[in-house]
Amino acid sequence: SDDKKAKAATSSVLTKFTQNQIQEMKEAFTMIDQNRDGLIDVSDLKEMYSNLGTAPQDSVLQAMVKEAPQMNFTGFLSLFSEKMSGTDPEETLRNAFQMFDSDNTGYIPEEYMKDLLENMGDNFSKDEVRQTWKEAPIAGGKVDYNAFVSKIKGKEQDDA
């Protein structure tokens, strides 16, 4: 039955991620699902981007949800697993930030980046965010997220 297929698809997608990643994805999904109906659609994306202070054209938004006009969490995971298969964590982080950079400027508003880091579950405590922030590549209230990701990742290697 379709139900069985859907369940199988869900579980195979879930096996590609660690529990931690799934938790993070859930939080990202919830951040984007502005009306909390369990589905991401064009209106959610619109809302999210307007909260970011940008407004991509409808055609851009439509293209984003073209594959799945009403995307549930599983669909969201599938999309990510396709994008992530074979990518390294650095790439994954970059891609995540890129989603919030609709004009592909390479920058995200500082406040938004802070929110993002603090809301990503237990990954970063306020102190860690503050610590990382001291070294973050910020100019004019915008964060260069590519440099930022390299910095975070470089840090992890130093600690290892």
Swiss-Prot record:
Modified positions (Phosphoserine) in chain numbering: S11
Domain of life: Eukaryota
UniProt GO MF annotations: calcium ion binding
Binding site for Ca(2+): D33, N35, D37, D44
Domain EF-hand: 20-55, 88-123
GO CC, alphabetical: myosin complex
Modified positions (Blocked amino end (Ser)) in chain numbering: S1
Pfam families: EF-hand_7
Key words of the record: Calcium, Metal-binding, Motor protein, Muscle protein, Myosin, Phosphoprotein, Repeat
PROSITE patterns: EF_HAND_1 (PS00018), EF_HAND_2 (PS50222)
Additional facts recorded: This chain binds calcium.
Function statement: In molluscan muscle, calcium regulation is associated with myosin rather than with actin. Muscle myosin contains two types of light chains: the catalytic light chain, essential for ATPase activity, and the regulatory light chain, a calcium-binding protein responsible for Ca(2+) dependent binding and Ca(2+) dependent Mg-ATPase activity.
Protein name: Myosin regulatory light chain, smooth muscle
Source organism of this protein record: Spisula sachalinensis
